[in-house]
Amino acid sequence: MALLLCLVCLTAALAHGCLHCHSNFSKKFSFYRHHVNFKSWWVGDIPVSGALLTDWSDDTMKELHLAIPAKITREKLDQVATAVYQMMDQLYQGKMYFPGYFPNELRNIFREQVHLIQNAIIESRIDCQHRCGIFQYETISCNNCTDSHVACFGYNCESSAQWKSAVQGLLNYINNWHKQDTSMRPRSSAFSWPGTHRATPAFLVSPALRCLEPPHLANLTLEDAAECLKQH
């Protein structure tokens, strides 16, 4: 749990925002951009507001600051999108605003959106880790909007039998991952070509799980895995 409480750390800057993966994003934000001219009495608000809307996706990823992959479930993406569109639609229902009001409200909605996305991603990971053993759930990658998944290991086992089964499942998962990773590398090459080596699953690279990192994966035993997890 301590690991989950400090997930807000670092993310790639060269990425897009999660909300742009929603099916209505283009339509909604096209409307918002084209109607920004009618929202303020002061002409200076127009370019500022337009820039906020244009850079919305890229700025979102820059502000997420997540140490875990920015992957969100479709259900939670729908919830976030619905909340953001409601706030934006309500803002656009008003007539012209006094100078400075409209861009400030856009910034407030933007910050609330970032907060909602952070919570959605972290809540899914916490729910996953409240299970017993290996669990995977389907997600959308905020980087490129492709279908993806997240794997985690949950410690919420109610009996020694469940715990043993969970550890065995983890061992099988790691061994299968290692075999697949090895098969992706060129046999005749002394080094890895770009794209031929996969990153270690995120839930295996926390500081508390050093014993599950390469090069230990290939020869990991059930006893070793159990001991490592007990230390965690």
Curated annotation (Swiss-Prot):
Protein name, UniProt field: Izumo sperm-egg fusion protein 4
Other comments on record: Izumo is the name of a Japanese shrine to marriage.
Keyword Secreted: yes
One cellular component term from this protein's GO annotations in UniProt: extracellular region
UniProt tissue specificity: Detected in sperm.
Subcellular location(s) per record: Secreted
Sugar-modified residues: N24, N219
Pfam family, one: IZUMO
Major localization listed first in the record, in broad terms: secreted
Originating species: Homo sapiens (Human)
Coiled coil spans: none
UniProt similarity note: Belongs to the Izumo family.
Gene (name only): IZUMO4
Protein keywords: Glycoprotein, Secreted, Signal
Species lineage: Eukaryota, Metazoa, Chordata, Craniata, Vertebrata
Signal sequence, start to end: 1-15
